[in-house]
């Protein structure tokens, strides 16, 4: 019982391993749980248990992901590891496993490979804010100069995608040696150094409740004698009776005052992130607000029609399209609580997009929707999901 209590006093941070196939992501994940369990308690998860990752669904897409946890002196980490490259792409784009930071695993023997580059680019596109590097298999490289060279290459690659390459912590070690209990510099001590790098380089994540208030509108009712009530799940922040909010998206932005906050038919002084609430709006008519808009703290979010996005297109086996799509493709984009039709513009030199591909696209919606960078969405045709995406840049 006491242990449960103790756990919750540590700050919770979400991380994950990224990097090229066979560079040792899963071995490192196992090593982190082993060293963490030995030093701070918790459960050791063996390689095989992590590798047999269960399938889960996120936004209609099946992804294999292994979830493990471990502790350091000051934090409790929830860590995701994916068995296949396609699972990484899907995981990062759907935000199924939101990461406060990532551990880039790169083999010292091979140096950066195509997926190393692709995962760094994806991390940049989908808004993974911090990266720490583990240079794995350091026992396979005798030449110190070669290690320096690989480290330099990794730093250059990070800088190329706007991560602070020169200031990123790079820990050299061998995940396998650490798993075997090796106490030399590249064994267990390397894992301890990596854990310390996570603690110091990844800042404390901002909690949803500390961000400005935002609630997507799910339903609108008119209550006679009281006015218009808007219901939804508060995404972030806190709302109090008397607060001014903006109604953003679909039509021109307007302002109103919240005159009541209800949960489970009880009146409250305030609602906060995670609450399913009904907000009573002063002087707002039933037809002036609709599903798909958001209520937000004034000035914190704007509506946009055009944006760039990183998208993953479902394969036929996943229940997606059976045929490719071309420039000018117009599906529906499901953002927060509504479908909005939009037109897809492919990058120069890309003729078509096949089911199973991931690609950067530009989208023009028919109506403006409240969004910012990092906003997740599903791509749908006739009510079925055919893809998933994340806004990487707002244009207009």
Swiss-Prot record:
It catalyses: GTP + H2O = GDP + phosphate + H(+). Residues 174-176 are annotated as: G5. The keyword rRNA processing does not apply. GO terms for cellular component: cytosol. Mg(2+) binds at residue 26. Monomer. One of its GO terms (molecular function) is guanosine tetraphosphate binding. It is found in: Cytoplasm. InterPro entries: EF-Tu_GTP-bd (IPR041709), EF-Tu_GTPase (IPR050055), EFTu-like_2 (IPR004161), EFTU_2 (IPR033720), G_TR_CS (IPR031157), P-loop_NTPase (IPR027417), Small_GTP-bd (IPR005225), T_Tr_GTP-bd_dom (IPR000795). Pfam families: GTP_EFTU (PF00009), GTP_EFTU_D2 (PF03144), GTP_EFTU_D3 (PF03143). Its EC number is 3.6.5.3. It is an enzyme of class 3 (hydrolase). PROSITE patterns: G_TR_1, G_TR_2. Residues 136-139 are annotated as: G4. The gene is tufA. This is Elongation factor Tu. Residues 10-206 form the tr-type G domain. Keywords: Cytoplasm, Elongation factor, GTP-binding, Hydrolase, Magnesium, Metal-binding, Nucleotide-binding, Protein biosynthesis. GTP hydrolase that promotes the GTP-dependent binding of aminoacyl-tRNA to the A-site of ribosomes during protein biosynthesis. Residues 81-84 are annotated as: G3. Residues 19-26 are annotated as: G1.
């Amino acid at each position: 019982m006491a242990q449960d209590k103790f756990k919750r006093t540590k700050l919770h941070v979400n991380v994950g391993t990224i990097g090229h196939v066979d560079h040792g992501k899963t071995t490192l994940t196992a090593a982190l749980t082993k060293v963490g369990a030995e030093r701070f308690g918790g459960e050791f998860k063996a390689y095989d248990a992590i590798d047999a990752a269960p399938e889960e669904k996120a936004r209609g897409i099946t992804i294999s992901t292994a979830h493990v946890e471990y502790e350091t002196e000051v934090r409790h980490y929830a860590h995701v590891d994916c068995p296949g490259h396609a699972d990484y792409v899907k995981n990062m784009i759907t935000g199924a496993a939101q990461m406060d930071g990532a551990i880039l695993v790169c083999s010292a023997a091979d140096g950066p490979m195509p997926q190393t580059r692709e995962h760094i680019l994806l991390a940049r596109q989908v808004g993974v804010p911090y990266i720490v590097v583990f240079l794995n298999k350091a026992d396979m490289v005798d030449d110190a100069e070669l290690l320096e060279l690989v480290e330099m290459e990794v730093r250059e690659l990070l800088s190329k995608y706007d991560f602070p390459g020169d200031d990123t912590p790079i820990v050299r070690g061998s995940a396998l040696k650490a798993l075997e209990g090796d106490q030399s510099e590249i064994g267990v001590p390397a894992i301890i150094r990596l854990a310390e790098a996570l603690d110091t380089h990844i800042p404390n994540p901002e909690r949803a409740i500390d961000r400005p208030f935002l609630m997507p509108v799910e339903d609108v009712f008119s209550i006679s004698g009281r006015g218009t009530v808007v219901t939804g799940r508060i995404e972030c922040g806190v709302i109090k009776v008397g607060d001014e909010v903006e109604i953003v998206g679909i039509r021109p932005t307007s302002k109103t005052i919240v005159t009541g906050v209800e949960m489970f038919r009880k009146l409250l002084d305030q609602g906060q992130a995670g609450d399913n609430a009904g907000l009573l709006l002063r002087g707002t008519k039933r037809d002036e607000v609709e599903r798909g808009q958001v209520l937000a703290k004034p000035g914190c979010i704007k509506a946009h029609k055009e944006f760039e996005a990183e998208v993953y297109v479902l394969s036929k086996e996943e229940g997606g399209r059976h045929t490719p799509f071309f420039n000018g493709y117009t599906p529906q984009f499901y953002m927060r609580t509504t479908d909005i039709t939009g037109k897809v513009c492919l990058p120069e030199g890309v003729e078509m997009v096949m089911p199973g591909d991931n690609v950067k696209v530009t989208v023009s919606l028919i109506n403006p929707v409240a969004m910012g960078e990092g906003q997740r969405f599903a791509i749908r045709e006739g009510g079925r999901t055919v893809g998933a995406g994340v806004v990487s840049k707002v244009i207009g």
